[in-house]
Each structure stands twice: as C-alpha cells, then as structure tokens.
C-alpha cells in the first residue's frame, strides 16, 4: 500500500479513485493532479513505480489536505462563533445556517425531539 499524506492509499483501485481516499481531494482535484503529472487515470496504484508515487506525494503536498484542512475548517467555524455574526450564532445553536425552515424539518441539524415537560 502506498502512503500519501499520512493515508494508506488502496492498491487495487484506479489512481483517480484511490486519491479520493485523502480528505480534501475529490474526483476533480484527483484528475487535475494526475493530469499535471502525466499519469493515466486508469492506472492502478499497484502498477505505479516508486518514482511516480513520489511525484504523487509532491502533487498532493501542494494542496491543503487531511489534518491541516480539518483544522482550517474548524478554525473558520470557531472564528464565526467568536465574531457573534448570524452564521456563528446558528452554529452555536446547532441550527441550519442558510435560511432553511426550522418550524418543521431540520431534524438532522437539531437532533432528536426533546419532549415538553408538563
């Protein structure tokens, strides 16, 4: 198994799909990385040479992925909450952020129903 960005990449999958195992790399970015390096999308990871895997590591290293990306996203949310802006307040109260209705629906975001005590 090749190890890229601290993640074990599955050998039996095509390169374009295998790279999506890394948090922060989807199909589009995966295709772009492979195109820049001149590696075919249909090649399986197990068929790549050590040189090509090193090139992949360098290609992925250009982007913010895995722990750094998770930290960046959580810090952005924390910044909104500290500012006290509308989106920050909605995050704090675990409610939808983008104008969806909450009188009905929004159960995923709000969590299970809380019974009213009499």
UniProtKB/Swiss-Prot annotation:
GO terms for biological process: translation. InterPro entries: Rbsml_uS13_C, Ribosomal_uS13, Ribosomal_uS13-like_H2TH, Ribosomal_uS13_bac-type, Ribosomal_uS13_CS. Located at the top of the head of the 30S subunit, it contacts several helices of the 16S rRNA. In the 70S ribosome it contacts the 23S rRNA (bridge B1a) and protein L5 of the 50S subunit (bridge B1b), connecting the 2 subunits; these bridges are implicated in subunit movement. Contacts the tRNAs in the A and P-sites. PANTHER family: 30S RIBOSOMAL PROTEIN S13/40S RIBOSOMAL PROTEIN S18 (PTHR10871), SMALL RIBOSOMAL SUBUNIT PROTEIN US13M (PTHR10871:SF1). Gene3D superfamilies: 1.10.8.50, 30s ribosomal protein s13, domain 2. Part of the 30S ribosomal subunit. Forms a loose heterodimer with protein S19. Forms two bridges to the 50S subunit in the 70S ribosome. GO terms for cellular component: cytosol; small ribosomal subunit. SUPFAM superfamilies: S13-like H2TH domain. Belongs to the universal ribosomal protein uS13 family. One of its GO terms (molecular function) is structural constituent of ribosome. This is Small ribosomal subunit protein uS13. Keywords: Ribonucleoprotein, Ribosomal protein, RNA-binding, rRNA-binding, tRNA-binding.
